Amino acid sequence: MASIRELHEQLVKKERSAVEITQETLDHIQELEPKLHSFLHITAQQALEQARAVDAKIAAGEEIGLLAGIPIGVKDNMCTKGIPTTCASRILENFVPPYESTVTQKLLDAGAVVVGKTNLDEFAMGSSTENSAYQVTANPWDLSRVPGGSSGGSAAAVAAEECVVALGSDTGGSIRQPASFCGVVGLKPTYGLVSRYGLVAYASSLDQIGPFGKSVEDTAILLKAIAGYDPKDSTSLKVEIPDYVASLKPDLKARGKLRIGVIKETFGEGLDSVVEQAVTKAIEQLQRLGAEIHVISCPNFRYGVPSYYIIAPSEASANLARYDGVKYGWRAPEGDNLLSMYKRTRATGFGAEVKRRIMIGTYALSAGYYDAYYLKAQKVRTLIKQDFENAFKNVDVLVSPTAPTTAFKAGEKTADPISMYLNDLMTIPVNLAGLPGLSLPCGFDEQGLPIGLQLIGKVLREDQLLQVAYAYEQSTSWHLSQPKIS
């Protein structure tokens, strides 16, 4: 599939219509979905209506933006008016929101064509998209393997060209890890840069919506469209949004000296040797492009996973208390009384992983353990944030592997939650610190599975992050590789 800019030029020159592009995309989805299961809901009728509106604008001689007529996928934990939003959970089965999330409203205002809602781990809790109550998404590079998670549906859809770009959410790595596994670009913005209004909450102090694309430029275009202050989100930042696309230059030294820090704690035990080799070669390539390379230490990085798995479940236990079968969503057959109905609904409506995290969070917040667990985890979070602040005194951008391995087999880790949690070892600290993080392809293993390089930036320096990613991408050809889906 062509890039956003190529499709835009075809539309403006009237070489193709938005309806033609949309119909071709829907046909491609219909062909691949029996194998991939990237989408929970395909919105063909609405998509074609949106495409016709774009064609009418072009016919009337009106100018259209870069995203007008572009097929986009949206993770199914973002509210879409009149379209089911299930969070891949039985408890929200058949829930149709009466309002639009801020990010999807921005897409519609830009003329984008939403072709469907993508699969995820239930309530975004997982690293493999195996926790969905409805279906398991396959990795386009190897259908027996997972696409990562929790935004696995969005990553797989972009990799398989079922849409040009897609939206995901990232609480502990849920955009970057699937981007790594599926060989696409995925960006988690600075906390507060993109509105969370209409995003179904998992852990409110960590959740952030971000873009997936086949290229850095496509990712930058989508970020520009969704970023910005929103009075409906109390954590939204009142900042000026730069032109992320204009900042993309193939010359890494276009803005002067660039210092890149390699986080030494992300190399060593637990890291696959083939991943280490690919990331090391990527760092060497950045050096050849003119970057100064420094090895730096973030000593508290290793405590990211244990602190995250206290903070995130604690917030989830509060956020998910609203699902009781009364106001919306699925309700279990009524029991003897109201309390019985609550219990039956929650016991049968939530999946095993969601119930596990609710229990962990409830335990960590209980009166006798609050100081020992939750308060301590928040102190560790502060230490991790300080590690990053100290590192950024000496460097501009940090690098690490995105994930310790390439995509694993479906079912391989479902019986071992700890092994599954360690998939986000490299990504979680970035969320705890509220920083921007990006994953882009930097190689393949011997089985042809993609490997991701993680770039971490200073607060609100997505422009610099995208510039480094673009310079690396333009000097390599990893992003041009395409999975052969049989």
UniProtKB/Swiss-Prot annotation:
The organism's taxonomic lineage, starting at the top: Bacteria, Bacillati, Cyanobacteriota, Cyanophyceae, Nostocales
Subunit structure: Heterotrimer of A, B and C subunits.
This protein's encoding gene: gatA
A single Gene Ontology CC term: glutamyl-tRNA(Gln) amidotransferase complex
Annotated PROSITE patterns: AMIDASES
GO molecular function annotations of the record: ATP binding; glutaminyl-tRNA synthase (glutamine-hydrolyzing) activity
Annotated InterPro entries: Amidase, Amidase_CS, Amidase_dom, AS_sf, GatA
Active site positions, chain numbering: 75 (charge relay system), 150 (charge relay system), 174 (acyl-ester intermediate)
Organism of this sequence: Trichormus variabilis (strain ATCC 29413 / PCC 7937)
Family: Belongs to the amidase family. GatA subfamily.
Protein name listed in UniProt: Glutamyl-tRNA(Gln) amidotransferase subunit A
Keyword annotations: ATP-binding, Ligase, Nucleotide-binding, Protein biosynthesis
